[in-house]
């Protein structure tokens, strides 16, 4: 079972949003959303393998099938709720996999800056090599050097515009992670290890919401491609945001998520 926190709604709501974070993060990345969400719905935040307070055994292989089973075990505790599964980046890849192979019924899927994997085999092998090299940096150079490099990636350039306190909190959260377990996470379920789900996503039979930032050209392209393939999909391009929409545009993110959930509630 995954480490989680349940945040009960102040209303008598049967809706539950499950929030899956990205790499070198944990469930605290969603702290700024809890108040707004619980004013309307219930929230479940989760620490994925190798992150936060997760206790997954390092002798296990943390592949997508393994994580899917852990998520099955966790969501089974909340099967009385209408479950909406959200995932950001790495968490979005897990959410996509779960939507196809998980056993607990989902009422909706929310994908933030996410991808169904790498279609080209040569590109996938190249990404595995990148993930393995980054894992070695974590193990040899240490967490602070890795975080310094991670913060400079073009993917996170728009985070430079965040206020000083927010940037401090993000950096502190990253530096609180365990470098050995992060390295294992990269090797076991990094982007390169994800099965290519592009041929499968047309089988997703639940309402799906795709969220991308207007500065994130790569994931805008991926998002629109997914939108063409998943039968019941809506896409939201958030102005003024990069890859981490839930961090960079908190109010707009909350509005999109709650709007999607309320719309599906009315359709049921």
What positions do the PLM features span?
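Active-site loop/oxyanion-hole signature of alpha/beta-hydrolase fold enzymes
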Residues: 44-86, 255
């Amino acid at each position: 079972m995954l480490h989680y926190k349940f945040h009960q709604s102040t209303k008598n709501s049967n809706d539950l949003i499950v929030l899956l974070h990205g790499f070198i993060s944990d469930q605290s990345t969603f702290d700024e959303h809890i108040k707004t969400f619980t004013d309307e719905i219930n929230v479940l935040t989760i620490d994925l393998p190798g992150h936060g307070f997760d206790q997954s055994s390092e002798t296990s292989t943390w592949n997508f099938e393994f994580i899917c089973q852990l998520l099955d075990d966790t969501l089974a505790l909340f099967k009385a709720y209408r479950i909406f599964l959200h995932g950001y980046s790495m968490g979005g890849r897990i959410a996509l996999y779960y939507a196809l192979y998980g056993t607990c019924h989902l009422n909706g899927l929310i994908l933030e800056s996410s991808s169904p994997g790498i279609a080209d085999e040569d590109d996938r092998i190249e990404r595995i090599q990148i993930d393995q090299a980054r894992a070695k940096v974590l193990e040899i150079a240490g967490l602070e050097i890795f975080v310094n490099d991670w913060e400079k990636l073009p993917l996170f350039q728009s985070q430079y515009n965040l206020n000083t306190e927010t940037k401090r909190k993000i950096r502190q959260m990253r530096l609180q992670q365990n470098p050995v377990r992060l390295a294992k996470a990269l090797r076991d379920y990094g982007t390169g290890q994800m099965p290519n789900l592009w041929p499968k996503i047309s089988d997703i039979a639940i309402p799906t919401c795709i969220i991308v930032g207007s500065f994130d050209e790569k994931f805008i392209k991926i998002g629109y491609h997914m939108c063409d393939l998943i039968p019941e999909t809506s896409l939201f391009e958030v102005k003024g945001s990069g890859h981490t929409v839930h961090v960079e545009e908190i109010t707009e993110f909350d509005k999109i998520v709650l709007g999607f959930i309320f719309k599906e509630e009315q359709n049921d």
